[in-house]
């Protein structure tokens, strides 16, 4: 990951605040040269700007259209993508997979209601969820649903909003 960017994506303020301890740790890691954080809200961008990180930059998440996600990946060249909570984006996942960029779903959350929606499209769902390299769900329920939807590598990490940064001690080098 020396030459590449570590990319985090969270929808808004809550997800971004939950990864601040991880960002702080990665900021201190000399092997990590650039950290990209994307979100969909201006408020999360404003909060990030208050931290004055040196290696971390914020961009807004692109529309999940095939051409936009391809261009985004080509421009930023992430070595690792970490999506927070329930951020499931089919085109982005597919293009990360095609480029052999590992994808972690951190603090993964799938409710019964969400699961029931995904199971109406079993082939489509499997095609998306099997592209997750590692899922770190909040609880056993989310683990069960992720497995049923096609995710293979799942380890319960708890809710990082309450228990701290599970990923900060996770061996990301094993995903190379």
Residue ranges and their predicted role:
Residues 2-171, 175:
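Active-site and donor-binding regions of nucleotide-sugar-utilizing enzymes
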């Amino acid at each position: 990951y020396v030459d590449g960017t570590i990319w985090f994506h969270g929808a808004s303020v809550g997800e971004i605040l939950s990864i601040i301890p991880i960002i702080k740790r990665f900021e201190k890691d000399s092997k990590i040269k650039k950290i990209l954080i994307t979100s969909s809200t201006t408020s999360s961008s404003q909060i990030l700007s208050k931290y004055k990180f040196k290696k971390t930059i914020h961009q807004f998440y692109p529309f999940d259209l095939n051409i936009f996600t391809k261009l985004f990946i080509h421009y930023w060249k992430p070595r690792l993508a970490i999506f927070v909570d329930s951020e499931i984006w089919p085109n982005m996942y597919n293009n990360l997979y095609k480029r052999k960029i590992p994808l972690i779903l951190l603090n993964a959350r799938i409710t019964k209601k969400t699961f029931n929606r995904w199971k109406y499209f079993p082939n489509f769902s499997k095609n998306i969820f099997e592209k997750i390299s590692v899922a770190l769900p909040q609880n056993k329920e989310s683990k069960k649903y992720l497995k049923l939807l096609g995710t293979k590598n799942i380890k319960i990490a708890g809710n990082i909003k309450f228990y701290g940064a599970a990923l900060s001690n996770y061996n990301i080098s094993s995903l190379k």
